């Protein structure tokens, strides 16, 4: 049974569609990638799940179920409680995600104390254990540090520890290595996968990088213009992508085993055809 079930989810900004009848499932313990170029709607799906969509965006239809509960049918306070107990986010930029004027310790323990009702002592002990688990040396010192006193990679490790603090059943990782240099990216990807396997957490990995998908994901969903174009197992996708856009996206991805590869951008014809298809679908449903 899927832990996360999204069915026919649609959203708009005014008259402009942002998500178009999106359906996808993530099973317990599964690692699924959400793939697409900028503006495809990847992050909007994550925000819709977590209830953090910008105020101007309105959900116009569909369901989002976490462990069988339809989040969109819950009152705001109940929805926050359910999400706080079952899901967490690893954000893109650790520097902006962390509060610059608060020490690291309270930023990890706040969720445990405020949402789950843990004692401060138990929450601090849990935070120390998690910082050690994500391979941060001297966790006690880091608990007392401010974000600016840590490197980018250390800050991202803090956010990973924070995401796993309440033992969520679903982690949404929103391009979590974008703000890091290449050598640190590899370490963080390995750490996320290690933590996901150890805690048997479902992972929805938002990315535009198919190389990352190949390293850590089992399945993927390809988006364009807020619409799902293809779903596949990762091995099957890389062997034989089915949708023309998926094939073009794969052809535009550098292969480190072929330094002489000629990269082919996604043909404008495919983009034009997709945009025309989306405009036609919009006219027939309004």
Predicted regions and their residues:
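Conserved ABC ATPase "signature" region
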Residues: 70, 122-141, 250-251
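Conserved ABC transporter NBD signature motif
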Residues: 58-70
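A short, proline-enriched helix->beta-strand linker immediately N-terminal to the Walker B motif
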Residues: 165-169
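A short, surface-exposed alpha-helical micro-motif characterized by mixed small hydrophobic
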Residues: 213-215
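Short catalytic/signature loops enriched in Gly
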Residues: 137-141, 231-286
